Curated annotation (Swiss-Prot):
Additional notes on this entry: This protein may be expected to contain an N-terminal transit peptide but none has been predicted.
Bias (Basic and acidic residues): 35-48
Protein name, as recorded: Succinate dehydrogenase assembly factor 2, mitochondrial
Cellular localisation: Mitochondrion matrix
Subunit record text: Interacts with the flavoprotein subunit within the SDH catalytic dimer.
GO cellular component: mitochondrial matrix
GO biological process: mitochondrial electron transport, succinate to ubiquinone; mitochondrial respiratory chain complex II assembly; protein-FAD linkage; tricarboxylic acid cycle
HAMAP family in alphabetical order: SDHAF2
Chaperone keyword on record: yes
Role: Plays an essential role in the assembly of succinate dehydrogenase (SDH), an enzyme complex (also referred to as respiratory complex II) that is a component of both the tricarboxylic acid (TCA) cycle and the mitochondrial electron transport chain, and which couples the oxidation of succinate to fumarate with the reduction of ubiquinone (coenzyme Q) to ubiquinol. Required for flavinylation (covalent attachment of FAD) of the flavoprotein subunit of the SDH catalytic dimer.
Keyword tags: Chaperone, Mitochondrion
Residues covered by region (Disordered): 35-67
Amino acid sequence: MSAPRILHRVARPVPSSISTITRLNRQFGTTALRLKDGSDEASPEVKAHRANQANKAPNQFVPNTTSTMTKDFVNVGQKPAPPEMLNSANPNYRPSDPYPGRIEHFTGGRQDNGAQKPELGVGEMEGITFKVEPLKRVGEELATKRARLLYQSRKRGILESDLLLSTFADVYLGKMNYDQLVEYDSFLDENDWDIYYWATQDSPEEISPSTPKEDTITETWKESGAKSGEWAQTIGAFRAAYRPVPSRWQNSEVLALLREHVRDKSATGFEKAKNKKTGGGGGLGRMPDVQVFNSGHIVHRRHVLRMLYI
């Protein structure tokens, strides 16, 4: 290296850390860099607000089955209170729920149940003064009833219920007697997600203590490596909370058959199927072919089912 270059490097000043920070700061704006010291604290109003929020009790848990439009819900003025203002409007408020023990179960015993409301029937909603009565058929022939129930089992509107009820109807609908058909007809008037969870979830007493008390996002799918099958990235990433079966379906023969159908078809989803030595069933697969019900036998066809009677 030549002597002039060496002298130039020695004479060049070394930039300090403060000048480097200032120079980098000037690349993005004209505001000078201000380092935090002991005097840089929040204003008294901010500290008072933080202390007020920290001393408040947690907001009450309100399940999705509790309506906020009823008269017993807390109001702020003339309107219902938003969820984040419940503890401010009434710290002692306890929401009412038609399912006994649901709030205590979801909160892990942190919150007691409020006033017990009667279970909602089919077509009933909280906060309304009328009831949406299901459509009843009178004088319907047996083959026509089976064809209609098959259509209602296949056209639910969500994929889970479509697969569950269409495969169930393919196996059991042709074998049901008249009383079972009437019960299945009433069962199909229930909410789709309720039917799905009633059929696929075990009661909390029959499964492990790790059953979630509320809908939770898990990390199991990250630890177990790649998954195979449809929607592989979502397997094990979500566990739904337990939905209790209402008293009107506690001893239902149709619901028992539907649960048995899930156990026979389940590969890994049902808790009891995981312990099967045979490895469980092969899953629901696809929607089966349409059955055409005649008076004495069943014919399988591949064409689209026409509505015989609604």
